[in-house]
C-alpha cells in the first residue's frame, strides 16, 4: 500500500511540475518540450535544480503534441467563457487532465480528474476547483470513445504501414 501511495505522490509531483512548465512556457512564449528537456538536463548538472521526473516530460510532450485538439475539446465545454479568458494555470491544468483522459491509458479517469481538481486547489483561485471539475466531468463522458477511436486509428495506421512496405518491395 505504501508503494502505491508513493507512486501516486510521485505522479502528483510530476503533474504539478508539468503545470509549472506549461505555465512558464506560455508566459515566456517558449516551447514547453524544450523547456522541460533543458531543465531535465540542467538538473543532472546542477544540484540546485530539482530533478524532472520522466512522467513530467511525457505529459508536457503529450500536451504540446496534441495542444490544438486539447484546446478544441476544452473550448467545446466552456459556457460563456473563452479559453483565453481562463487563468493560465487553469488552462495548463485542464490541458494536462484532458491529455491524461484521452491518452494516458494507465491513469484511471477518476484519478486524472481528482488530480486536476487538487492542483487547482493548490495553485489557482477559490473558484477554479469547481470549474475544473465541471469541465472535466463533461470531458470524462467522451474520453472512452476518444480512446477507442485513437486505438482503432493506430491499428489501421500500423496495418497500412506494414502493407505499403510489402507492396513496395
UniProtKB/Swiss-Prot annotation:
Taxonomic superkingdom: Bacteria
Gene Ontology annotations for the cellular component aspect, listed alphabetically: cytosol
Source organism of this protein record: Rhodococcus jostii (strain RHA1)
Annotated family: Belongs to the NusB family.
Protein name: Transcription antitermination protein NusB
Swiss-Prot/TrEMBL keywords: RNA-binding, Transcription, Transcription antitermination, Transcription regulation
A family per Pfam: NusB
GO molecular function: RNA binding
Listed GO biological process terms: DNA-templated transcription termination; transcription antitermination
Function per UniProt: Involved in transcription antitermination. Required for transcription of ribosomal RNA (rRNA) genes. Binds specifically to the boxA antiterminator sequence of the ribosomal RNA (rrn) operons.
Disordered: annotated span: 150-169
CDD domains: Terminator_NusB
PANTHER family, sorted: ANTITERMINATION NUSB DOMAIN-CONTAINING PROTEIN, N UTILIZATION SUBSTANCE PROTEIN B-RELATED
